[in-house]
């Protein structure tokens, strides 16, 4: 069979029609909650990938020549189809990735919002008229698509990380080739199928899945027809891709690792801070690049915050994301679970204490845990945890806090809670991060620029800046006037 029995529950079977029956022609996809084999996703050979890039190059010329309004119309139809298939797409994502169904359906809506946004931005790629330095010249700029763009996307947000890149690329007039994670390819093929149903040509948007991620990355970074690479993943891999892309000066966008501080000042609304901490930390079982990774709480409110935070954490239900009432699904793999557990064990050995009793769970499930008496020098504070663990550190002054919060190579997201307007501005400007949530634990939206500083990456996704990542600015100088 090309699909496991569970996959028969997807009502719109066109979303999984790409799956192959022969294991020799595909990559096995399993449910991390149950270990069940879901089926096989089609794998691309090296020649397949090279052919995809060639076809994308040819198709891009025709796609860019279409009126922006025409491209926008297809993107809007894609957006509508994503909404209409929210139930099936959410279920498919939960099956292959593990997150609770409500979160998965929420990701479908979030991912779709980028398609809607960039459908409108497609019609607003304005140039400029520049006042000339002399009377006989006229100066203008125009924006043009850069050509073939490619992307490598992660498993933790298997739909949104594709639409956040494909939306602006297609809106700009680029063609787009994406390699999703081998752990979660089904969602990628499904959203591409809906794009085709919306009228987007199959050569303009392509999904390729290689057995060897490094090989695909090497093809993307070395192929002369690819002019842009967008990557979401670890800083370590991003660094390699940037080095490889430098050979022919490809443009790159990198959304890399994070180590987000979540800060609670002594003048904070503690209940609001706890609610924000829950939203920021435990979404997708803590497997997000922008989730709170380390908590800094002022000594005056440390005990109060710890007590309320842990009480809320103990109410979380761990289990299969398809089951009613589940808040926390499995982590993605056994190696991920072992790495998270090693950080917990190391912190406890160094003096940290779990606020509530630790529970070891079977399979890929992990009980959420709050650790108190954590110190800034512990490994769990400097590493990106990527799991349902919240280490909480004390601080006594704003200056001490800023020094600790900025003591990292990363600079993606940060969060803090305070009701003092003077402190709010001071801290917001002092934090060395691309994004700052102020009295808010959920900050990502299609209308605002998403991205980091330092070794958390370069470039921005979403907002009006997102489409510029896929366009060249050309300056035209008219003489003889």
List the model feature ranges, each with a label.
Residues 127-272, 395:
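Rossmann-like NAD(P) dinucleotide-binding subdomain of oxidoreductase/dehydrogenase enzymes
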Residues 175-177, 354, 435:
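A short hydrophobic/small-residue beta-strand
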Residues 35, 56, 71, 93, ...:
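Residue-level signal for inorganic ion chemistry
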Residues 37-44, 59-65, 151, 262-265, ...:
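Short, well-ordered beta-strand elements within core beta-sheets of diverse protein domains
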């Amino acid at each position: 069979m090309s699909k496991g029995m569970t996959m028969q529950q997807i009502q719109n079977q066109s979303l999984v029609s790409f799956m192959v029956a022969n294991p020799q022609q595909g990559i096995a996809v399993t449910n991390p909650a149950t270990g069940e084999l879901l089926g096989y996703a089609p794998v691309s050979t090296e020649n397949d990938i090279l052919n995809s890039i060639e076809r994308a190059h040819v198709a891009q010329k025709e796609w860019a020549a279409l009126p922006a309004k025409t491209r926008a119309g297809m993107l809007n139809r894609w957006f509508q189809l994503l909404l209409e298939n929210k139930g099936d797409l959410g279920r498919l994502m939960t099956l292959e990735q593990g997150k609770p169904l409500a979160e998965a359906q929420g990701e479908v809506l979030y991912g779709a919002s980028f398609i809607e946004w960039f459908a409108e931005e497609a019609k607003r790629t304005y140039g400029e008229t520049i006042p000339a330095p002399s009377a006989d010249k006229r100066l203008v700029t125009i924006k043009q698509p850069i050509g073939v763009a490619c992307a490598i996307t992660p498993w933790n947000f298997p739909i949104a990380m594709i639409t956040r890149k494909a939306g602006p690329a297609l809106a700009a007039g680029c063609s787009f080739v994406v390699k999703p994670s081998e752990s979660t390819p089904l969602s990628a093929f499904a959203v591409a199928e809906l794009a085709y149903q919306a009228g987007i040509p199959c050569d303009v948007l392509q999904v390729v899945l290689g057995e060897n991620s490094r090989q695909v990355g090497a093809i993307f970074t070395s192929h002369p027809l690819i002019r842009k690479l967008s990557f979401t993943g670890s800083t370590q891999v991003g660094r390699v891709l940037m080095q490889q892309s430098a050979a022919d000066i490809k443009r790159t966008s990198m959304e890399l690792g994070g180590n987000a501080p979540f800060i609670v000042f002594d003048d904070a609304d503690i209940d609001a801070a706890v609610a924000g901490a829950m939203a920021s930390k435990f979404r997708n079982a803590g497997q997000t690049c922008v989730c709170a990774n380390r908590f800094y709480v002022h000594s005056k409110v440390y005990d109060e915050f710890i007590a309320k935070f842990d009480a809320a954490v103990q109410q979380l239900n761990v289990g299969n994301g398809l089951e009613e009432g589940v808040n926390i699904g499995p982590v993605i793999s056994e190696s991920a679970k072992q790495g998270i557990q090693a950080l917990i064990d190391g912190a406890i050995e160094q003096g940290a204490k779990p606020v509530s009793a630790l529970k070891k769970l079977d399979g890929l499930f992990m009980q959420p845990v709050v650790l108190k008496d954590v110190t800034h020098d512990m490994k769990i504070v400097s590493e990106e945890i990527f799991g349902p663990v919240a280490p909480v550190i004390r601080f006594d002054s704003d200056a001490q806090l800023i020094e600790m919060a900025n003591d990292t190579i990363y600079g993606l997201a940060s969060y803090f809670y305070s009701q003092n307007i003077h402190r709010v501005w001071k801290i917001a400007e002092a934090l060395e991060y691309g994004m700052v949530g102020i009295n808010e634990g959920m900050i990502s939206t299609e209308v605002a620029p998403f991205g980091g500083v330092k070794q958390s990456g370069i470039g921005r996704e979403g907002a009006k800046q997102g489409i510029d990542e896929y366009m060249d600015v050309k300056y035209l100088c008219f003489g003889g006037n």
